[in-house]
């Protein structure tokens, strides 16, 4: 049975051994559900129906089924930080996105059979390590050049935020997707399109009669201008792809060593915490657990079982 790793697995190994053992060895995640992940997952499901040829109504019904009940129970629409994840905000944004950007208007053609494609591709000649993931759309074909690309949907609080676009310049996920697609299909895959959808709070929902300083009219009349969607092309040189593979195999070996060295919860106090040195503790899901001293007897209270397949997408 080969060792299977996703991009998120390798990224976690690169950041912190403790987070790696917790997430992938002991299969634990932070208690509670992340609104960003919950909304992002629902948007992905909505787009899957849309890109596979479903109607706008069918796509929005999927969004409602996956997100409405949870959002209404967990999100305060007036909350300064979480309000953008309210059901009404997500519903309005996605309803407009589907109306404004039909699949037929994209600069490439989409094969419905190549939407939401799971893959497991051997990283090594022996086949003992496989890279796994889910491509939101594989082998889309540019209408003008006839070249092939992949597509990855991304939701974010701010497309124009200083950190959003730069994360893809050297990021491993798109390089890994590109390498995997080139291994899977006979056609030459040129790059990956990031379909970025901004899930920021629409000002219209807070005060529809307030006048917009940018458009000179009430927010209720210009709210659609505040929906931000961008299609961003990511490309890599041949050397960058080769270097990625070398690094991916090295991190996979380190991952294997961690699982073998620290197989039980009782080993947690001995696992290295590199995050203290590289800053990854700041946004880590396990920060509270580690700050409390990694209490093994509190593991079941401070964390919860993790759904493995959710890792494939990131």
Predicted features and spans:
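Hydrophobic/aromatic-lined pockets within catalytic cores
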Residues: 26, 48-55, 102, 123, ...
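Non-catalytic protein-protein interaction segments used by genome-maintenance enzymes to assemble
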Residues: 114-175, 179-181
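Nuclease catalytic cores
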Residues: 10-53, 91, 116, 280-286
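Metal-dependent nuclease catalytic regions and adjoining charged, substrate-binding loops involved
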Residues: 5, 167, 179-314
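Conserved aromatic-histidine-acidic binding/catalytic patches
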Residues: 31-35, 39, 82, 125-126, ...
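A non-catalytic, helix-rich entry segment at domain boundaries
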Residues: 46-118, 122
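Active-site-adjacent bridging/hinge elements
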Residues: 16-22, 147-155, 254-257
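Regular secondary-structure segments
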Residues: 44-55, 252, 256, 260
């Amino acid at each position: 049975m080969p060792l299977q790793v996703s991009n998120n697995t390798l990224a976690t190994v690169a950041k912190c051994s403790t987070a790696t053992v917790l997430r992938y060895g002991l299969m634990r995640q932070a208690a509670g559900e992340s609104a960003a992940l919950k909304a992002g997952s629902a948007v992905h499901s909505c787009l899957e129906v849309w890109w596979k040829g479903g109607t706008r109504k069918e796509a929005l019904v999927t969004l409602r089924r996956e997100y409405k009940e949870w959002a209404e129970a967990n999100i305060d629409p007036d909350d300064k930080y979480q309000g953008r994840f309210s059901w009404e905000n997500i519903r309005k944004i996605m309803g407009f996105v589907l109306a404004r950007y039909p699949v037929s208007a994209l600069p490439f053609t989409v094969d419905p059979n190549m939407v939401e494609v799971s893959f497991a591709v051997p990283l090594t000649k022996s086949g003992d390590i496989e890279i796994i993931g889910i491509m939101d759309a594989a082998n889309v074909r540019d209408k003008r050049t006839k070249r092939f690309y992949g597509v990855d949907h991304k939701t974010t609080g701010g497309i124009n935020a200083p950190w959003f676009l730069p994360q893809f310049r050297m990021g491993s996920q798109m390089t890994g997707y590109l390498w995997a697609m080139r291994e899977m299909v006979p056609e030459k895959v040129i790059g990956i399109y990031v379909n970025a959808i901004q899930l920021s709070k629409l000002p219209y929902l807070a005060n529809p009669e307030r006048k917009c300083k940018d458009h000179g009219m009430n927010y209720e009349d210009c709210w659609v201008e505040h929906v931000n969607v961008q299609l961003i092309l990511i490309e890599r040189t041949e050397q960058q792809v080769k270097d990625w593979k070398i690094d991916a195999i090295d991190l996979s070996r380190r991952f294997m060593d961690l699982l073998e060295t620290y197989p039980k919860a009782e080993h947690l106090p001995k696992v290295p915490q590199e995050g203290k040195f590289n800053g990854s503790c700041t946004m880590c899901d396990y920060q509270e657990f580690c700050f409390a001293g990694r209490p093994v007897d509190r593991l079941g209270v401070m964390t919860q079982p993790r759904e493995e397949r959710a890792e494939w997408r990131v």
